[in-house]
Structures are given as structure tokens and as C-alpha cells.
């Protein structure tokens, strides 16, 4: 694996962290043990190094303890699903993966039990989420999860057929494969930010959500490109750029960083163009925007400072200061 220089990423937003982060980590490690995700001391040591609760605590800095645990468990579940796809080669078995995700959709839509570790744990999360969100919120969240699972099927089909997506295809699908739209929907129940549909669906708000998603996902692709290149997974913006343009890995990293930085500029510009929806709604919208900003910094801070998941400090990666 060649040595690559990672670009220095700086955001014009504050880095925050929830006061309940340590307690949420303890709850999260107990949760994965109780549901059977972790069965050995070695696996628990790896889990502790991943520090999943820190990502949730940075992204939702003002959430209460119960809400923080709920979203930390949810994001941990997503990582566990991702790992099981890798370990069981589930990510290459498109038809079987559809069967598995159909079970998860039945949990969401009908509260139908699924007697697996992933199924039982997802039911536990969904029961807590249902208690926090009304039916309108639940409908939005279910749609975001359905889109996420559909994007997983797309990736699995590509892997099974040895297809490398084009850059255009990848950029279109990447906001869904990261499941961040589900986390954005969760802002309402986790940080208690209540915005009516006409504000959430306003075209500037929608583009800000997409910009946040792109920034987070493309930064993640930079951090994880070495790991995914080793695993032979092409679903990474750096790697599809390298393939399509026949460039070096470093050139592809640099282009991904340029695209990422342009999206940050767009985000900050669009914030200034948001219309007023009245004093009360403007305050709620500012709280919503604050969580989007927190997600952007949370992803970077967690990836670089907290977790051992992406190994961004390995010798094959040099951070450019």
C-alpha cells in the first residue's frame, strides 16, 4: 500500500461533545454485550477502541442521556451491520441481503420480531424511538431507512458483478449508503428540534442537509480509503475517482479533498441565504443547523482523535499539516 498524504481538514464550526459521553459509552458496551454482539474479551477491547458513543456525543451535543444512548445504540447497530456484511461476505450476496433487510423493514413497519442478534437489537432501538417520535416522524425515519437498505443492495450488486461505479453514480448514491439521512431525521427525537414539513422540505434546507451529508461522507471516504483499498471494496469516492480517471491514489485523495472543501464553502454560503420563518421557527431552525454543523465536526474529530476504526494514524498515511 503506497504512502498517501491526507489533507488537513479545518471546519469553521465549533467542536462540541455531550456531557453524558462516558455514561453513554458504558451503556453502549453493556448493550452490545447483552444482545450478543460481543462475546469475548478481545472483541470487547476492539469495541472499546472504536468508541462509537463518542461519535454520537459529538454529533448530538445537547441530547439528554436516554436520547444519547438511543442514537449511540442505533449508530453502533449500523456499524455492526456493516461489519457483519464484511465478515460474512453478506455485502456480496445481493439476494440474501435483501431478505435480511426485508426483515428489518418488517420491524419498522409492523413491529414483526426477527430472531437474530441484529433483529432483536434493532427491535429494541425501534421501540425506544417509537416512544420518542410521533407517527409522522416515524414515517420519515422509515423512508430514510428504506433508502439506506436499497443503497446497500446497490453496493452488493456491484460487488457481486465486479462493477466499479462511475463517479457520477457514486456521488448520487453515497448520501444514502452512509445512512446519514436517518441520523438527520433523528434530530427531532434526539435533540427535540421540531420543524414543520414546509421548513424541512424548503429547497435551501434540503440542500444544506445534502451538503452536510456529502461533507461527512466524503471526509469519511478520505479517512477510510486505505482500509477499503486493502479490503478490495471500491465503494469509496477516492477509489472510484482513481479508477475512472486512471490517476494515482494521491491525486484521487487530493480531488476528493477539493470536492469536500467546495461543499463546505457551499454549506456556509447557503446558511446565509436561509429565509426567515418567524422568530420562533428561526430559533428552531438554528438549533437544527447547529446539529448539522456538529455532525460535520463530529465525523472528523471522531475519525481522527477518538476511534481506532479507520487507523488514520498508521504509517501508510501521512497527515499533511
Swiss-Prot record:
A Gene Ontology BP annotation from the UniProt entry: terpenoid biosynthetic process
Binding site for Mg(2+) 2: 86
InterPro entries: Isoprenoid_synthase_dom_sf (IPR008949), Terpene_cyclase-like_2 (IPR034686)
Cofactor, how bound (note): Binds 3 Mg(2+) ions per subunit.
GO molecular function, one term: metal ion binding
SUPFAM superfamilies in the record: Terpenoid synthases
Site-annotated residues for Plays a critical role in the stabilization of intermediate cation: 79
Any Pfam family the entry gives: Terpene_syn_C_2
Pathway: Secondary metabolite biosynthesis; terpenoid biosynthesis
Keywords: Lyase, Magnesium, Metal-binding
Residues engaged in binding Mg(2+) 1: 82, 86
Annotated positions for site Plays a critical role for substrate recognition: 83, 155
Cofactor(s) in the UniProt record: Mg(2+)
Extent of motif DDXXD motif: 82-86
Record-listed E.C. numbers: 4.2.3.62
Binding-site positions, substrate: 174, 227, 309-310
Positions contributing to Mg(2+) 3 binding: 220, 224, 228
Domain of life, per lineage: Bacteria
Residues carrying the site annotation Plays a critical role for abstraction of the pyrophosphate group: 178
Catalytic activity: (2Z,6E)-farnesyl diphosphate = (-)-gamma-cadinene + diphosphate
Function comment: Catalyzes the conversion of (2Z,6E)-farnesyl diphosphate (FPP) to yield the bicyclic sesquiterpene (1S,6S,7R)-(-)-gamma-cadinene via a 1,10-cyclization, which requires the abstraction of the pyrophosphate from FPP to yield a germacradienyl cation. The only accepted substrate is (2Z,6E)-farnesyl diphosphate (FPP).
Family: Belongs to the terpene synthase family.
Free-text comment on this protein's domains from its UniProt entry: The Asp-Asp-Xaa-Xaa-Asp (DDXXD) motif is important for the catalytic activity, presumably through binding to Mg(2+).
Name of the protein in its database record: (-)-gamma-cadinene synthase ((2Z,6E)-farnesyl diphosphate cyclizing)
Amino acid at each position: 500500500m503506497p504512502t498517501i498524504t491526507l489533507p488537513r481538514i479545518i471546519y469553521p464550526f465549533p467542536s462540541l461533545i455531550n456531557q453524558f459521553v462516558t455514561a453513554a459509552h458504558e451503556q453502549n458496551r453493556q448493550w452490545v454485550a447483552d444482545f450478543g454482539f460481543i462475546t469475548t474479551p478481545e472483541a470487547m477491547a476492539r469495541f472499546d477502541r472504536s468508541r462509537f458513543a463518542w461519535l454520537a456525543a459529538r454529533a448530538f451535543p445537547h441530547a439528554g442521556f436516554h436520547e444519547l444512548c438511543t442514537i449511540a445504540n442505533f449508530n453502533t447497530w449500523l456499524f455492526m451491520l456493516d461489519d457483519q456484511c464484511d465478515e460474512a461476505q453478506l455485502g456480496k450476496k445481493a439476494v440474501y441481503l435483501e431478505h435480511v433487510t426485508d426483515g428489518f423493514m418488517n420491524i419498522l413497519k409492523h413491529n414483526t420480531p426477527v430472531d437474530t442478534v441484529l433483529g432483536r437489537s434493532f427491535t429494541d432501538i425501534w421501540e425506544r424511538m417509537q416512544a420518542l417520535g410521533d407517527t409522522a416522524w416515524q414515517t420519515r425515519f422509515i423512508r430514510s431507512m428504506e433508502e439506506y437498505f436499497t443503497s446497500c443492495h446497490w453496493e452488493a450488486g456491484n460487488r457481486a458483478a465486479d462493477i466499479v461505479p462511475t463517479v457520477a453514480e457514486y456521488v448520487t448514491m453515497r448520501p444514502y449508503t452512509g445512512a446519514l439521512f436517518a441520523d438527520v431525521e433523528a434530530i427531532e427525537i434526539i435533540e427535540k428540534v421540531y420543524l414543520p414539513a414546509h421548513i424541512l422540505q424548503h429547497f435551501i434546507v434540503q440542500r444544506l442537509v445534502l451538503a452536510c451529508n456529502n461533507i461527512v461522507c466524503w471526509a469519511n471516504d478520505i479517512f477510510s480509503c486505505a482500509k477499503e483499498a486493502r479490503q478490495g471494496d471500491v465503494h469509496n469516492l477516492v477509489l472510484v475517482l482513481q479508477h475512472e480517471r486512471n490517476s494515482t491514489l494521491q491525486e484521487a485523495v487530493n480531488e476528493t479533498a477539493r470536492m469536500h472543501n467546495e461543499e463546505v464553502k457551499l454549506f456556509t454560503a447557503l446558511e446565509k441565504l436561509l429565509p426567515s420563518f418567524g422568530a420562533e421557527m428561526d430559533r428552531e431552525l438554528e438549533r437544527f443547523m447547529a446539529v448539522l454543523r456538529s455532525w460535520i465536526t463530529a465525523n472528523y474529530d471522531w475519525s481522527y482523535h477518538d476511534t481506532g476504526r479507520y487507523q488514520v494514524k498508521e504509517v501508510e498515511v501521512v497527515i499533511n499539516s
